[in-house]
Amino acid sequence: MTSLPLGVKVEDSAFGKPAGGGSGQAPSAAAATAAAMGADEEGAKPKVSPSLLPFSVEALMADHRKPGAKESSLAASESAQAAGGLAQPLGVPPGSLGVPDAPSSPRPLGHFSVGGLLKLPEDALVKAESPEKPERTPWMQSPRFSPPPARRLSPPACTLRKHKTNRKPRTPFTTAQLLALERKFRQKQYLSIAERAEFSSSLSLTETQVKIWFQNRRAKAKRLQEAELEKLKMAAKPMLPPAAFGLSFPLGGPAAVAAAAGASLYGASGPFQRAALPVAPVGLYTAHVGYSMYHLT
């Protein structure tokens, strides 16, 4: 309570009195006291270090690192790997830290990894060491992602025509027998029962063999005859060129009828005048060019 009035009095005494004469020491003492109080306040405030901020432009451009930062990061990584291998510095390969990798121990599955999303066991993500085992995971072998294997069906058994058990083997004809049969066929295509029996005995053949040979030979002759007739028809057909115009009439059509009517009316006017022959004018509507040129040549 007593300090505040004293301070006011000091200020009144310091600024109320005019400077000069014997009272000049009072203002200097007050200034010294104020400077001492300001120095104590500055010492009590925390000093701001002039070092650069870590994310400022100057810090990024300078890229100064403390000498103990690398050692601390190495120690932290070693301790993390010794604890369980969960933590690893970002951007640093695992072999560069001097710690050998453990290939046999699989890494635990994370929440956002492939195995974690698909809920697969850890053994499914480990690569097969032996080359004989196919590198296919269970989700690839499921029918949802891969088609089912094709069933190998056994080939159907080839069913052959069953012959009769009492069927006689086919006896090939000799050259002499074939010549005799061909000569007899040219003479007569149909044999009677007596002629067939006599002819078969002369060739040392059965009547059935001679009968079947004549039947086959008649069928062959019929096929050859039909082929020859087809060739003759193709040769006799005239090779006409396609029509030059769409509209055409036969030669001497409506024009010939009109000419004949005019000749009957005006042709025989005199006793010594010849009868006029109907001449069809050559034009667009008489006949197509190909047909007329073919018959003119």
UniProtKB/Swiss-Prot annotation:
Residues 25-38, 71-100 have a biased composition (Low complexity). Interacts with CREBBP/CBP, TBP and SP1; interaction with these transcription activators may inhibit autoinactivation. Interacts (via C-terminus) with PIAS1 (via N-terminus); the interaction is required for the localization of both proteins to the nuclear periphery and specific binding of MSX1 to the core enhancer region in target gene promoters. Interacts with H1-5. Sumoylated by PIAS1, desumoylated by SENP1. Sumoylation of Lys-9 and Lys-127 not required for interaction with H1-5, transcriptional repression, inhibition of myoblast differentiation, or binding to gene promoters. It is found in: Nucleus. PROSITE patterns: HOMEOBOX_1 (PS00027), HOMEOBOX_2 (PS50071). One of its GO terms (cellular component) is nuclear periphery. Keywords: Developmental protein, DNA-binding, Homeobox, Isopeptide bond, Nucleus, Repressor, Transcription, Transcription regulation, Ubl conjugation. Residues 127-136 have a biased composition (Basic and acidic residues). Pfam families: Homeodomain (PF00046). Acts as a transcriptional repressor. Capable of transcription autoinactivation. Binds to the consensus sequence 5'-C/GTAAT-3' in downstream activin regulatory elements (DARE) in the gene promoter, thereby repressing the transcription of CGA/alpha-GSU and GNRHR. Represses transcription of myoblast differentiation factors. Binds to core enhancer regions in target gene promoters of myoblast differentiation factors with binding specificity facilitated by interaction with PIAS1. This is Homeobox protein MSX-1. The keyword Transcription regulation applies. Residues 166-225 bind DNA. Gene3D superfamilies: Homeodomain-like. One of its GO terms (biological process) is negative regulation of odontoblast differentiation. InterPro entries: HD, HD_metazoa, Homeobox_CS, Homeodomain-like_sf, Msh_Homeobox_Regulators. Residues 1-50, 63-109, 127-157 are annotated as: Disordered. The lineage of its organism: Eukaryota, Metazoa, Chordata, Craniata, Vertebrata. There is a cross-link at residues 9, 127 (Glycyl lysine isopeptide (Lys-Gly) (interchain with G-Cter in SUMO)). One of its GO terms (molecular function) is DNA-binding transcription factor activity, RNA polymerase II-specific. Belongs to the Msh homeobox family.
